[in-house]
DNA sequence: AACAGTCTCAACCGCCTCGAG
DNA sequence: TCTCGAGGCGGTTGAGACTGT
């Protein structure tokens, strides 16, 4: 073997990087490009291991890294993706242009996790905490605006307002199924233990749909009740996701400024229908007539790393099969979920 | 002003996967 | 086919900043 270890050596420096070291690393990568991290320290004149150089570059020095406060849209994306994917920081970071996995991870651990707990939501399962909410079906409120309000109105906290959004029966049935343990959420991953009496491929797809059902439940219950700002300014939000906002905004006045929306009734099927109608004008749409289960579903629609793009597809399925979560689990030996 | 407690986040640690040899 | 190192990733640490008393 000609390979040499790239992180072993005498007198390697650890700890915080100095400005001088940063300059050397930036200068070297500017001239020679990324890669070959094993050799970079020696060639750049740094007493660091290659791995340390790579981390310093990818997490801090890289020119296209966005730093500073996370926007509301970014926060919502993080929460939604965390609900469905768990601590997959690199996957989440891919949906947030110019954000690093390390930054997303830190932001989650220091800000979002605490706020979810404050609002009575388990940051691991994304379900209401049992101790704070005796009714597991009733969505808890996550107030996206609290952070900005805290400075100005520290004595006011809308999180004390009771959750006021009764979800439709369809969504409630899905959420209650999830809450009752028929789907199991482990370490933030939604893993549907309900076994469907179908072929392996369709079973996997159903479980994908189930996973998305839980995330849409979370995002809707939190987004509708929280304060949303116009999605038009958001960057990187897929169209279908933006449309869900637009629909809500079209139907609820002052959504962008109200904290407690107090929506008396929200018709989830109607929302999905609207979503589909909106999408009919676009390309690459799976219409209600298309059987998501039996077709060779294009892989682009079930890309696990692009779940936001799947909303149209699985919401269409939910509309057609509102009771899919109740389907028989007989005869299934399916073990490869998701 | 001094101290203690808390928070933040850059950096490190260690495990895993992939691919070169 | 096997070995092993590079690179990727998530978890954890700890120094410095911040806040409260």
UniProtKB/Swiss-Prot annotation:
Q: Where in the cell is it found?
A: Nucleus
Note down the stretches annotated as region Disordered: 123-171, 176-195
SMART domains linked to this entry: SANT
Q: What induces it?
A: Slightly induced by auxin (IAA) and jasmonic acid (JA). Accumulates upon mechanical stimuli (e.g. wounding) in inflorescence. Down-regulated by sulfur-deficient stress.
> What UniProt keywords are attached to this protein's entry?
DNA-binding, Nucleus, Repeat, Transcription, Transcription regulation
Which cysteine pairs make disulfide bonds?
none
Highest taxon listed in the record's lineage:
Eukaryota
**One annotated GO biological process:** response to water deprivation
Q: Where is the composition biased (Low complexity)?
A: 155-171
Q: Name one GO molecular function term.
A: transcription cis-regulatory region binding
Expression tissues: Expressed in both vegetative and generative organs. Mostly present in inflorescences, flowers and seedlings, in the transition zone between roots and the foliar part, and stems, and, to a lower extent, in leaves (in midvein and trichomes).
General function of this protein = Plays a role in determining the spatial distribution of aliphatic glucosinolates (AGLSs) within the leaf, mostly short chained. Together with MYB28/HAG1 and MYB29/HAG3, promotes aliphatic glucosinolate biosynthesis and represses indolic glucosinolate biosynthesis, but could not activate AGSL biosynthesis on its own.
* Quaternary structure and partners: Can form complexes with MYC2, MYC3 or MYC4.
Question: What is the name of this protein?
Answer: Transcription factor MYB76
Protein species of origin: Arabidopsis thaliana
Tell me the organism's taxonomic lineage. Answer: Eukaryota, Viridiplantae, Streptophyta, Embryophyta, Tracheophyta
